[in-house]
């Protein structure tokens, strides 16, 4: 995360065309906002981007259901992401979800085994991975969702401590 403004498409026409988005739906974005707030990170202080620079979806009625990108799509976009990170030069890099983590840390990386751990990487002084905020919404019940929210916020606090070590 750096001191640059966030990147996210808010224009519905851009969404329909498959432009870059922060989260496939507003609920996932709200979970990210909750986690950032709980960790003491201002949204304006976070630079947000995606591994795959298009929103892949399946239409179901009036809804657009997010589809996980295929491996070749991730591989095609990863050089662009690495170039983006070279320009941004973040102080801390939090990889949200398996797609981001595997794209930058390798296909064998498992978020479930290493979430919240400081990771050895040349991508930034601090690199860590956690779940994608929309995963909180897939928890089976309210209690599980609350536990996931707390764990997600704690993962983000690792980055917050690097950015403001007081």
Language-model-detected regions and their locations in the chain:
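A polyanion-binding, active-site-adjacent surface
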Residues: 1-166
